[in-house]
Structures are given as structure tokens and as C-alpha cells.
Amino acid sequence: MESTTVLLAASTLLLVLHASYGQFPRACSTAQVLLSKECCPVWPGDNSSCGEVSGRGVCQDVVPSNSPVGAQFPFSGIDDRENWPIVFYNRTCQCQGNFMGYNCGECRFGYTGPNCTVRRNMIRKEIFRMTTAEKDKFIAYLNLAKRTISQDYVISTGTYEQMNNGSNPMFADINVYDLFVWLHYYASRDAFLEDGSVWANIDFAHEAPGFPPWHRFFLLLWEREIQKVAADDNFTIPFWDWRDAQQCDLCTDEFFGGTHPTSNNLLSPASFFSSWQVICSQPEEYNRLRIICNGTNEGPLLRSPGRHDRNRTPRLPTSADVEACLSLTDYETGAMDRFANFSFRNTLEGYAVPASGIANRSQSNMHNSLHVFMNGSMSNVQGSANDPIFVLHHAFVDSLFEQWLRRHQPSLDVYPEANAPVGHNREYNMVPFIPLFTNGEFFVQSRDLGYDYDYLAESGSIEDFLLPYLEQARQIWQWLLGAAVVGGLVTAVIATIISLTCRRKRRTKTSEETRPLLMEAEDYHATYQSNL
């Protein structure tokens, strides 16, 4: 605890100004920019828009996907997130080569160096395999992010219509940690309809094909923001391997807070996190008032692990559940929503039963089961990122997505190009991020993005080589078994024939000397051929 306190005290002196990722770049939040609809900030390195003079990028028109979407959201042109980010901006920086960022001032994931030409691969570790110093440093970084205002990004506190179509900007400052809470909220919030009602069956980050790649991108951005705010380029997100867990092993004061001695819903006062305030946790109130979460503190972090609805989630996922999920060969099926059967994505997300792959509305499995089990701030979808356990949980979910990608080796065509729920088609820009990236761009293996997981990296290259062939064998095992059975029967028949022939030969051996040699040979061959 002492080392955590020292790290936190020292790190609060840091305020690093970097290009960043998130929703609205501060440089693009003025009325002038909103009215022009051009978000192409200057890169300070050469004082040109998007770093064009240095060949980093150019300011280009946004070209949204025109592929048809599913019927889950039967409206068009009523939500700011549709065809992201066209409502707010129709021109943004298009970065070139390995450059990245809202002004092309940074490197793509997996690259570093002044010209972004140096490859690097980071390893994410299981939190219980970290040293005490590593764990304490991680907790200190979280607290630092919670207390550091983002220098590059602001959050929207109103719809585009409420901003009078850009002439009256409505934005607010936000700390680095809460920026990502807000991003998760904004992607999953309900839609305001023109008749004054809301539409709940819409989510740009969940319940559809984009769930794994959206959260993969989200975690990478979160990881890089922590690296910047802590001035530690080697920082990686830890994960919690919750397979076969019987309880919340992280819910202690050493990690993310034990239970308060007099209130089951609050955290122990001995934990750093007991002082944390949550945001974006009142969706019903936002809908009633038709407002956007503005980042205002709404109360303490809540958590009551294990005191949940046992009928919905009887237990946490087992190793068998994980293996059953990973064995599903189809990434997406049917309507590609929470009712999809035999879908790896839907089973991983937790809307289908792992053992059968069949969707079940009455149960929460896999990813969803952890959210239900925590029974607090993490159980509210829109505000679930308030709990720091969210990050470790989703990092492990991302590692399972990675296992599936390596085992099944899908091509990009496996990710649906059209007819997915709004926001989830392959070429749809992920909401609400600037710079722009599509869902399909993160349907790739983690090593292509510059990171790996310790338990996957240890498996070695031989397993990576064999996995595709083992998977092919698994898919045709019925045919292999049938061939083996038929082969065994044929072998048995041939052995029987040879045995009978040999016995007949022995019976005729005693009279060989009294018979002509030619006749003996003819009889022998006739008998062999007849038996065969």
C-alpha cells in the first residue's frame, strides 16, 4: 500500500500533452469547426493540417458505409451516431502509412519511433502473475487517470439538434478515466425518437458482430491513454482469468476493494476506490429528460459480488464453458443479434448457452455473467466501465476472442459486410471514435496490433502452426471415424479368408505326393480366388 501511495503522489505531478483518441477532439469542439464540419487539426510537428507537409496524412471527405443494416433499428436519420461521424463532421484526417491520431501525430498500434517504423509487441499479463510493485503501479496509474483532465478530448453534453446544429457547442471537460466511461456509455445509450419516446434496441458496441472488435479497439485506446498520462510507454493492461473462479478474487483491499463493513453495496474505506465517484449511471433519468450524460458525479462506486440473481447466473464460467464457446466455428449467424444461435460472438458475449450454442433470454453466461455477478456499477451496461474491474474482465474476454481467431483462422470475409444491426457492418466506422476506424480493421489477430497475452505467447509457434490443421481434423472427425471402422472390417474379412485358405492347404498337404503338380496348383488358385 505504501508503494502505491508513493507512486500516486509522484505521478500526480505529471500532465502530459499528447495527441489522443476518443470522441470529440478539443480542437474540433468550436462553433466554427462544427459549422464547417471539418475536423482536421494541425499537427504541431510541421504546423500543417493532419501533418500533410510531412506526409503523415491528408484532410479527406468521410465516406460512410452504404451497406444495408438490420431491422433492429427501423429508423434513419434520427440519431447522431448513424453513419458516424457525418452528423458532426464530414471531413477528417486520413492518416497514411503507420501514422495515426486525430491529427496523424502518433503511431499505429504495434509501431513506435519518430517515423513510426519500429515494430514492437507488448505482453499483457494475468494480474495474479504480476509482482506487487507492478500491481501497485497499475492501481496508482488508475487513480492518476481519474484525477487528470484530458487535454485533447472533451465530451458532448447535448445532441447535435440541441447544439442548434453546431452554432451552440455543448461540450465539457472530462478526466482521462471517465472519458472512457463516457465513450462506453455513448456507444450503448438509447436513441431519442422524434415523438418524444426512446428506442432501446440499439447499441453500437454490444449485441452484434462489433462487440469483440469494438472492445478490442476501446482497450487499446485506453491502454495508450494510460501510457501517456503516466509517461510509461511500457504499460500494458492486465487481465483477470476468471475461469472456474468461485468468487471475486479481485474484490479485496489489496486489489480493487473489499466489501464495506456496514454496507454490502459499498467498497471498504481501506481501498483507494472507495472514494471514486461514478458517472453515466442513470440511463432512465437521461431518457426521461432527453439529455446526454454530462460527466457529473453521481455517487460512489457500487459492488456487491455474488449477491445477484442466481437463477439468471448460477455460477461464473468454467473452463468447459470457455472451450465449448471457442469450439463454435461460425463467428456470426442468423439476424446477428442477441438471439443468434451457434454464434461464437453471441456465445462469448453471453446471450447463448456455451454447451449448446443456443440463445437463452433467461440466462446470462460468459462475458455477461461477470457483469451480473458483480451486482453493482458494473451491472449497468451503459455505466459498467466505472468499475476498474471492467478493464481486466474485458481484457480476458479479448484474449478469448484472440484464441478463437488463432484457432479458426477466419478471413475478413467472415465478418458480415451487410445486414448487421446498425453500426456493426464491416465497413461501419466504430462509434464514437475519432480518428475513424471500421469494425473490420480490428477483426485481426492481436500480434498485428502489437500486443499478446502471456498465456498465449507461452504456447509457442508450434501450436500456432498446428491449430488450423487440428481444427480441420475436428471438423471431419466423423468421416475419419467412419473410414477407420470400414478399414477395420475389411481387414478382418481379409484375415478370415487367409486363415480359411491356410487351413484348407494344410488338409490337402498329406496327399500332395499322389497328385499331379499342375492340378495341385490349379486347385489351389481356384480355391483362393473363390474364397476371396
Curated annotation (Swiss-Prot):
PROSITE patterns noted in UniProt: TYROSINASE_1 (PS00497), TYROSINASE_2 (PS00498)
A Pfam short name: Tyrosinase
Lumenal, melanosome-side segments: 23-479
Organ and tissue specificity: Frog skin.
List of glycosylated residues: 90, 115, 165, 234, 341, 375
GO CC term, one of those recorded: melanosome
Transmembrane segments: 480-500
Gene3D superfamilies documented for this protein: Di-copper center containing domain from catechol oxidase
Subcellular locations according to the entry: Melanosome membrane
Reactions catalysed, as given in the entry: 2 L-dopa + O2 = 2 L-dopaquinone + 2 H2O; L-tyrosine + O2 = L-dopaquinone + H2O
Topological category with respect to the lipid bilayer: Single-pass type I membrane protein
Keywords in alphabetical order: Copper, Glycoprotein, Melanin biosynthesis, Membrane, Metal-binding, Monooxygenase, Oxidoreductase, Signal, Transmembrane, Transmembrane helix
GO biological process: melanin biosynthetic process from tyrosine; pigmentation; protein homotetramerization
MF GO annotations: copper ion binding; protein homodimerization activity; tyrosinase activity
Signal peptide: 1-22
Necessary cofactors: Cu(2+)
Entry EC no(s): 1.14.18.1
Top EC group: oxidoreductase
Induction line: By seasons. Highest levels in the winter time and lowest during the summer (at protein level).
Residue spans, topological domain Cytoplasmic: 501-532
Residues where Cu cation B binds: 367, 371, 394
Note accompanying the cofactor annotation: Binds 2 copper ions per subunit.
Subunit (UniProt): Active tyrosinase has been found as a homodimer and homotetramer.
Family the entry assigns: Belongs to the tyrosinase family.
Protein's job: This is a copper-containing oxidase that functions in the formation of pigments such as melanins and other polyphenolic compounds. Catalyzes the initial and rate limiting step in the cascade of reactions leading to melanin production from tyrosine. In addition to hydroxylating tyrosine to DOPA (3,4-dihydroxyphenylalanine), also catalyzes the oxidation of DOPA to DOPA-quinone.
Protein name, entry field: Tyrosinase
Species: Pelophylax lessonae
